[in-house]
């Protein structure tokens, strides 16, 4: 498992017009997870791994929940 900090999103928009991330806020919350949807869902306290979309690059995991930007996990070395 890899160590990440959770960064919260300030999201603007709506389902009809689409969403955009207005600001990214560090939470100071550290979690350990792998990149599987079920693990990320459990660590973030979300109820349905089928509503989650995960986009992974080398240092950041971007998470959408129910088609809306939710948060990102930034890798800590």
Protein language model regions, located:
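Short aromatic-glycine-(Arg/Gly/Cys) micro-motifs in beta-strand/loop hairpins
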Residues: 1-26
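Compositionally biased, low-structure terminal segments
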Residues: 5-8, 33, 56, 68
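N-terminal targeting/docking segments
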Residues: 9-11, 23, 37, 61-64
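Local beta-strand/beta-hairpin segments that build beta-sheet-rich folds
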Residues: 22-31, 70, 76
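A short, charged, amphipathic alpha-helix used as a generic interaction element across diverse proteins
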Residues: 24, 32-50
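Short, mixed-charge low-complexity intrinsically disordered segments
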Residues: 42-77
């Amino acid at each position: 498992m890899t160590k990440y900090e959770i960064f919260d999103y300030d999201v603007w928009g709506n389902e009809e017009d689409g969403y955009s991330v207005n600001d990214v806020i560090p939470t100071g919350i550290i979690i350990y997870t792998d990149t599987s949807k079920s693990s990320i869902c459990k660590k973030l306290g979300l109820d349905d791994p089928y509503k989650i979309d995960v986009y992974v690059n080398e240092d950041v995991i971007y998470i959408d929940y129910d088609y809306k930007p939710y948060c990102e996990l930034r890798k800590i070395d």
